[in-house]
Amino acid sequence: MRRSPGSYVRIGRVDEVYLFDASSIVNLVRKGIVKPLADGVTLDLALYESLSAVWKEFKLLKRFDEAIALELLDIICDVFNAMKIISAKGLEKEVFDLASEEGLTIYDAAYACAAMRNELTLVTDDQELRKTASKHLTVISSSELASKYRD
């Protein structure tokens, strides 16, 4: 899935270099590290994936009570209000092709394609996505990124 340099479309400010998936967003919020999120971008689908992750931990895994779940939801919504949100609309064929070629879910392929298209570094804590996407683009974990913001 090679692209010619002219096929990339740059979004936002020049200093926006990170595209966050839902796993990295939720993990950074849990750690109380939100500055990198405000400086980055994500896909519109990440909000609902993030909310789903909180719901799963609250309702199914019972890792915390409803008050904590609602607090996390409020913080996540605030974070999304501060982030630049982009859409994967228009990438459907690329997303499907990448998912089919690499065995990714459509959601994971959407993050990878959006990062490739816009020359962004993908931030994910999903090990399978990281392993596969790193063949095509730069990928880091939220912990790696957080350490850059602490220094």
What kind of region is each of these model predictions?
Residues 1-17, 43, 49, 117, ...:
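Acidic, PIN/NYN-like endoribonuclease modules and their adjacent C-terminal/linker elements
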Residues 4-7, 83-121, 125-128:
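Active-site neighborhoods of divalent-metal-dependent phosphate/nucleic-acid chemistry enzymes
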Residues 9-25, 78-83:
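An acidic intrinsically disordered interaction segment
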Residues 23, 48-52, 74:
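Internal, well-ordered alpha-helical scaffold/interface segments
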Residues 23-32, 125-129:
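Short, polar loop motifs at secondary-structure junctions
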Residues 29-63, 67-68, 84-87:
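PIN/NYN-family metal-dependent endoribonuclease catalytic core
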Residues 51-55, 77, 96:
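Amphipathic alpha-helical segments within well-ordered protein domains
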